[in-house]
């Protein structure tokens, strides 16, 4: 019996658990420190799992904790099958899984398969010569006759995507940092090695994966130049506007059709184990939803994907929400999306969409309820349940190489990665040492312990609405049909079997009234919102919502 069979036996053997689930993302460096080094660790996650279970989440997603030189804080892996000592040990991970399963939480881990660290033994061997056993495990190419890179591909972190290696006298591809060389998945041996990594963690007991940069796995064998992207098609959803990466149409350096066959192989391994699921991160500013549709259709690749439509700086409006949901349905009528408003890579959404907001908490509660009412699976990022705003850091405190590169026009990702606040203490209850990133003092009044004592807090609202979602399966798994609305109102009907739930949201700082679009509506309670019904109209306060069952 594998560890997966042993620990997963504590959970219901539901192969469809992921559909409509609520997944809580943990950034381990910033969650809880237990050994006093200022960096969060696996034992800290285990200690805080009751908080997540108490929210009502179904699963956790843990950002990378593998052995790494930490140039990109774990997204540069030097050993896929071990835990970095700053986070703990494999035994600590086993204990984490056991406790999560005891609490009814499934565990998903973040796999970074498109690239490794330049310290990974595979790359150390690959760069040593052109004739070694792993010479073709990474993407190597000769220079042009004048010594310049093989083509015009750009790194998302700035500059050319090619780095010269003086030993091989060739360039290697890096879509991200120069210390993150891209693996060559055209090589069958590389695919086998990555599938072995997948199997290792499944046998260890994980319930699924978040697949980082899933559309970057393959590159064009011919290394053709990317075409220019006309200005009117550019947007800043996956890279900041100051980054020239947005000036290209990325049809050759990523989004390659060969990826579909590899994802089928990855899925086949998952299907050997009970109740496993994967969510893919699709990073593309023009074709994100289309690619997400390709990767989730057919039931033979990944179970769900998320693109950056709701992680982008674009203002969230009723029209935008409806547009994104409809676009995804057109791209993938049989696919499944995973929606998030915040994560470890973007400005926290309560700050990103704060223009014109006067009631921070009401705004946060409305956005949480909207997110958890959309058709799809939901990801919540740590601290989101506290309505934490983006932290402001001085340049001297920055750790993120992305922010350092583009400062001050783009301040990087550190502002959303500052430590979690548990207690109303200067250190937030995070660590007894100086934390790796400074704790925002504006976060302290929003600590878990503070909000626990306030039934009207955002934390209590998250718990309340998660329970409401579970009590109404149409919100988790139902179809969605948008209702005609105007101005700041967004309305839709969620349908699952015989259950139909009408949802109405006021996405503004001013009260709004809506004529009820259907008769025989029975208002629902337990969601935390108050509205006023007069005749056939419902009046919503600023940042208010209304839910009713169609009788």
Curated annotation (Swiss-Prot):
User: Which principal EC class is assigned to this enzyme?
Assistant: hydrolase
Key words, A-Z: Glycosidase, Hydrolase
What domain of life does the UniProt record list for this protein's source? Bacteria
| Catalysed reaction equations from the record | Hydrolysis of terminal, non-reducing (1->4)-linked alpha-D-glucose residues with release of alpha-D-glucose
Q: Name the active site residues.
A: 212, 272
Q: Which CDD domains match?
A: AmyAc_OligoGlu
Q: What is its EC number?
A: 3.2.1.20
Which molecular function GO terms apply here? alpha-1,4-glucosidase activity; alpha-amylase activity
Q: Name one GO biological process term.
A: oligosaccharide catabolic process
Q: Where is this site: Transition state stabilizer?
A: 345
Q: Where are the transmembrane segments?
A: none
The record's comment on protein family reads: Belongs to the glycosyl hydrolase 13 family.
Protein name per the record? Probable alpha-glucosidase
